[in-house]
């Protein structure tokens, strides 16, 4: 299982949120470039970067910093936050970003997601952010009436290769991932699934790995020391 250390960017700094609440922001590193380099030096093989400013503004805001992070880390990066157009995807991929995450637009503009997948294939991941099983949009500010399972099935029909599933109610809480929902997703679709939200320990990563998932994202638990980079490396290797 691929494990992605997470770096969330706000105002040029590396931050963590609690349940996606922008008012509950904690700065974990003022230098995201150094953070990316540190993760890679400690064994990270792929980074997950979210442009929170971009998610709010609906356009890439921190691309220059993200480019510097990739250059410093020398590992692949996937980036999400505010990606709403083909021009923005072109912008990221031509700048050396390895995979782009389409979030809210996957629900609000399915034609856009389909066009992106048709053009870029595996370089596109679709994000599903949900609360109590219902899909959220616009930086998690709006909750729809669409089931996460239904949206995943629609994405599979569009030939999406990778879905990143975030349980908002668990994100940044260290309460453990929603194993029931991830298991349901794994049964419902056959594409690559990446779990995000709530990972609090090495045992959580091992439990996700046992579900047969393609990947998992670790954020807050890495920053507060609940999970070490050596834990990540060992779980990744044992899962193959």
From Swiss-Prot:
Keywords: Amino-acid biosynthesis, Cytoplasm, Histidine biosynthesis, Isomerase
Reaction(s) this enzyme catalyzes, per UniProt: 1-(5-phospho-beta-D-ribosyl)-5-[(5-phospho-beta-D-ribosylamino)methylideneamino]imidazole-4-carboxamide = 5-[(5-phospho-1-deoxy-D-ribulos-1-ylimino)methylamino]-1-(5-phospho-beta-D-ribosyl)imidazole-4-carboxamide
One Pfam family linked to the record: His_biosynth
Group of enzyme by EC: isomerase
Subcellular location: Cytoplasm
Keyword field contains Oxidoreductase: no
Active-site positions on this chain: 8 (proton acceptor), 129 (proton donor)
Keyword Metal-binding in annotation: no
MF terms (GO), sorted A to Z: 1-(5-phosphoribosyl)-5-[(5-phosphoribosylamino)methylideneamino]imidazole-4-carboxamide isomerase activity
GO BP annotations, alphabetical order: L-histidine biosynthetic process; L-tryptophan biosynthetic process
Record-listed E.C. numbers: 5.3.1.16
A GO term from the CC aspect: cytoplasm
Assigned protein family: Belongs to the HisA/HisF family.
Annotated HAMAP family: HisA (MF_01014)
UniProt cross-references to PANTHER family, sorted A to Z: 1-(5-PHOSPHORIBOSYL)-5-[(5-PHOSPHORIBOSYLAMINO)METHYLIDENEAMINO] IMIDAZOLE-4-CARBOXAMIDE ISOMERASE (PTHR43090:SF2)
Protein name: 1-(5-phosphoribosyl)-5-[(5-phosphoribosylamino)methylideneamino] imidazole-4-carboxamide isomerase
Naturally occurring in which organism (per UniProt): Listeria innocua serovar 6a (strain ATCC BAA-680 / CLIP 11262)
Taxonomic placement: Bacteria, Bacillati, Bacillota, Bacilli, Bacillales
Gene transcribed to yield this protein: hisA
